[in-house]
Regions:
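Conserved catalytic alpha/beta core of Sir2/sirtuin-type deacylases, generalized to analogous enzyme cores
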Residues: 1-294
Length: 294
């Protein structure tokens, strides 16, 4: 399905848009959350600026990059340096406490509701906040998983224990060589299970989650579904945004809601069943919580 043009947020006030979203949430038979990087940004995960300087100022001084994202792609001279960066990166963005209660607020809105989460985020925040693992599909990987860099197999490995060891043992921005993780099958270096190219490993857990998502869609076909998109930008629209638009267009009982600061749009074809809120997720979730107690 092709859409002719996009429409931006309505002229309704923020409070009226929140009331519409609250009503759509309460009237829905099921809620499908589409979560992008903006949701984790709202939860306090800043990858540049003050937080970056506090956590990675020493790396910035030596290597010259100015944000965590760039540090992840830096061509380090050794695996010891590479894993010094990545172990600290994983620790602070996966294993340290979530800075703000944003994900917990979202879970509170979904309690006793039939929901599923589709996300491109890889920081494990949904599970850490208490979401049911069987209602989650992380399409792009997870910070807490390693995979073979070749890859020689379609397996992944939990990394929590080793990440903490590496983060604690590093000196002069290097980890001890003995801690460099290697594939137990072929001996190649392990790498992060994050989608970057065609070497990304989709393990049994990935396929099981994909099947559960498709089953959820089948079971709720033509029901009153709220497709609630939170912080989804335009980097990978084929995963969440375009499918949400298409499914809303096909199901006349569905509502599409887009919460995204500076980028709240929908096709004109579904404008009458769209709720577009140009604000960050933290502000919207706070407002929905207030609506709930009135």
């Amino acid at each position: 399905m092709f859409f002719s043009r996009l429409t931006s947020q309505s002229t309704a006030t923020f409070s009226k848009q929140i009331a519409k979203l609250r009503a759509a949430l309460d009237a829905s038979d099921a809620v499908i959350i589409g979560a992008g990087a903006g949701l984790s940004t709202a939860a306090g995960y800043a990858y540049a600026g003050e937080r970056f300087e506090k956590l990675f100022g020493d790396f910035a001084a030596r290597y010259g990059f100015t944000d965590m994202y760039s540090g992840g792609f830096y061509p380090y001279d050794s695996l010891e340096e590479y894993w010094a960066f990545w172990s600290r990166y994983i620790k602070c963005n996966r294993y340290d406490p979530i800075p703000k209660p944003t994900y917990g607020q979202l879970l509170g809105l979904l309690r006793d509701r039939d929901y599923f989460v589709l996300t491109t985020n890889v920081d494990h925040c949904f599970q850490r906040a208490g979401f049911d693992k069987k209602r989650l599909f992380y399409t792009q990987g997870d910070y807490d998983l390693f995979q073979c860099s070749k890859p020689c197999c379609q397996e992944t490995w939990d990394n929590e224990e080793l990440v903490h060891y590496m983060a604690a043992a590093q000196e002069d921005l290097r980890i001890p060589s003995a801690l460099v993780p290697r594939c137990p099958h072929c001996g190649s270096p392990l790498t992060m299970n994050l989608r970057a190219d065609d070497t990304f490993v989709q393990d049994k857990g990935w396929y099981a989650a994909a099947d559960r998502y498709q089953d959820f869609l089948r079971r709720h076909n033509n029901m009153r579904i709220l497709f609630l998109e939170l912080g989804v930008g335009s980097n990978t629209p084929v995963i969440i945004k375009y499918p949400f638009w298409q499914m809303t267009a096909k199901n006349e009982r569905a509502t599409y809601a887009c919460v995204n600061f500076g980028e709240a749009v929908a096709p004109a074809e579904i404008a009458d069943r769209s709720i577009l809120i140009d604000a960050d997720a933290e502000r919207v979730l706070d407002a929905l919580a207030v609506q709930a107690v009135r």
